[in-house]
């Protein structure tokens, strides 16, 4: 019996959310959970819109001083269940650089291993309300070097931070797509709404540009162009 070959014409889209789970997130725990679940729904809807050209996966890394909890790890979006109250319980410190470094490095290694067989796109969104204060494995320069290397491969990085000072962290690690986060119920809802709209624009633009059908170098250029204008709407 002939084995059916995998369809390699679709782009595998890896959606990574790196979510702060430090103690200060307790006051907006419900809003953070609701926002993540809305994002999951938004990605699921995007896959339905672009089912002929895109195949979506999600990784959700919730981090605090206790470690990095990979709630989802390259999970097919149709298999991702809603984030629950028990799965997201804020506590302790903010090892931001470790969370970014470990999660992005793992995905970089994985995508390099499958690059010969499939086209991949990676979107990384970092959501934090505080400063780095507990990393043990990664520092700012190491994270910056990793992010710059991944951006050259067409990855998109965005950083959502509470306060102008927190957003300066993004600049130090080579992330230019930033959004200010007002830590209220309404502010948290607005942040996730805007993030999901930006993500939808990115997916729709990928589909319009027929990214999966382009030559490898052309695909990379398209992704880099889309990544640079992630939060810039219709500009």
Label each PLM-derived region with a short phrase.
Residues 1-235:
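Acidic, low-complexity intrinsically disordered regions
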């Amino acid at each position: 019996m002939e084995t059916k070959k995998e369809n390699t014409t679709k782009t595998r889209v890896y959606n990574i959310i790196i979510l702060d789970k430090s103690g200060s997130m307790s006051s907006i725990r419900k809003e953070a959970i609701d926002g993540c679940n809305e994002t999951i729904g938004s990605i699921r809807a995007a896959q339905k819109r672009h089912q002929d050209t895109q195949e979506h996966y999600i990784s959700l890394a919730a981090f605090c001083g206790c470690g990095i909890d990979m709630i989802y790890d390259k999970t097919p979006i149709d298999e991702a269940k809603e984030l629950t109250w028990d799965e997201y319980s804020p506590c302790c410190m903010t090892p931001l650089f470790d969370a970014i470094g470990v999660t992005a490095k793992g995905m970089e290694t994985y995508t390099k291993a499958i690059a010969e067989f499939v086209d991949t796109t990676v979107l990384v969104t970092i959501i934090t309300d505080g400063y780095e204060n507990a990393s043990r494995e990664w520092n700012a320069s190491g994270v910056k070097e990793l992010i710059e290397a991944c951006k050259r491969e067409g990855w998109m990085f965005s950083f959502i931070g509470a306060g102008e000072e927190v957003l300066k962290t993004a600049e130090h690690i080579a992330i230019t797509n930033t959004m200010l986060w007002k830590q209220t119920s309404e502010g948290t809802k607005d942040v996730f709404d805007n993030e999901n709209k930006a993500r939808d624009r990115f997916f729709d633009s990928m589909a319009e540009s027929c990214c999966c059908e382009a030559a490898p170098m052309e695909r990379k250029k398209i992704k880099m162009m889309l990544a640079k204008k992630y939060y810039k709407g219709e500009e």
